[in-house]
Amino acid sequence: MTVVTRFAPSPTGMLHIGGARTALFNYLFAKRHGGKFLLRVEDTDKARSTDEATQAILDGMSWLTLNADEEPVFQSKNAARHVECAEQMIANGKAFKCYATPEELQARREAGEAKRAQGKQEGLSEADRNGLLAEANELLAPYRSPWRDGGDPPVPDAPFTVRLRAPDDEEIAVSDHVQGDVTLKTREIDDLILLRADGTPTYMLAVVVDDHDMGVTHVIRGDDHFRNTFRQLPIFAAMGWDIPEFAHVPMIHGSDGAKLSKRHGALSTLAYRDMGYLPEAMNSYLVRLGWSHGDQEVFTLGEAAAVFDLAGINKAPGRLDLEKLGDVNAHFMRNTDAARLMALLEPEIEKLTTLDVGLTERLQHALPTLKERGQTLPELAESCRFLWDSNAENLNKKARKALREDGIKRLSELREALDGADSWTIEALQGVLDAYCAAHTLSMGQVGPPLRAALTGGLPAPDLAPVMYWLGRDEVLARIEKHLPATGR
């Protein structure tokens, strides 16, 4: 058997991280077993589905490199096939035409709610209370249509829906890879609508038909769909189709255990891209958010695909931890090759300054060191600010203190020593600093602060010798000179 999984988003909004994790689990399971990973866009809700959301889903999948093995299936294009299957079930006695109107069904619900409210009133005898609540329960029970065993329409050409005839008094058993073995009495499900009164197929019918026609062997989805499984299995049975295996994955919660919301970080996948996270970091973080494999915390996509299994999915909801995501992203930034990291960083730098040839060269020299200094691309870009900004007009308190009297005197002497440096390498520049300290019986703790203040204005930066090498001789001398006139103030 070839394993076939599918990710089936509805294009009514962006691809959020919960959906991205579901897609990832489906992708990894298929790759682990040498199978196929498919994408189905469930766009049957024409009122809410948009082309923009569809494109955002496709873009999010592409960014995460979760590429489907076949072209996407658009559910709306299969409507004729869905109707055909409903008609086949009518012919086989598994489905029927129901002439109950929406108004009648609404009246039934309202009557049931009214009986329930009456049954909760004070002053009733136990017999009256029980009678009212029994009537309420009957009216509010899953709907069994009076036309389920046949019958003529109330009037000629009366509108109708097509409903699946729910099994009478049986148990539906689901053996779920995550939720375990669960059974449900069929009296707890209604005669499910397959075709609406306008002839369009419902979600429940479309999902089952498409899963069968696409050859899906494993349905891996959020546990908010778990109860739907008990309504979908009778459709498989009515059509005489093989039933796929199921794995219903718990939802992602916020760090406080509450339902995930925007304040927790419930953003679209592309929003995380725009915030400076790498796709490999998102994949690594999401795969560990509700799945475990030994003590390994960080995975490449290939590493995860080699070991991913359904048994490792936790039954409890995962909790979104943005600090942990930042740590994972920092790991992947540190391990990204210089050329790719430079390409990713350039747009962030351009948001802050003009990226000319000189700055590009400085960045290329500095990145192997500076890439340790941020958790996201914008943070990394900000840590590079000293490469183009001396911050001379916005010195912090520590920098201003370092540039008083003795500091300015040492800065003037250092400028002369640096101007006379035979070569401009990190080693040579460190030698100049060491020689100056030795000649004046000073420590680097006394010499470094004024020089750092002049070069970076208090902006965070690494060791001075590399900083001077990256800036270049002319820029270093110019930044020092900018502060030397202060001696006369």
Identify the meaning behind each predicted range:
Residues 58, 86-90, 283-286, 305, ...:
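Non-transmembrane alpha-helical segments in soluble domains
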Residues 425-471, 475:
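Helix-rich, typically C-terminal accessory recognition domains appended to large enzymatic cores
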Residues 26, 57, 89, 93, ...:
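Residue-level signal for inorganic ion chemistry
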Residues 399-429:
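Long, amphipathic alpha-helical coiled-coil segments characteristic
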Residues 227, 239-245, 249-397, 401, ...:
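Catalytic adenosine-cofactor/nucleotide-binding cores of aminoacyl-tRNA synthetases and other
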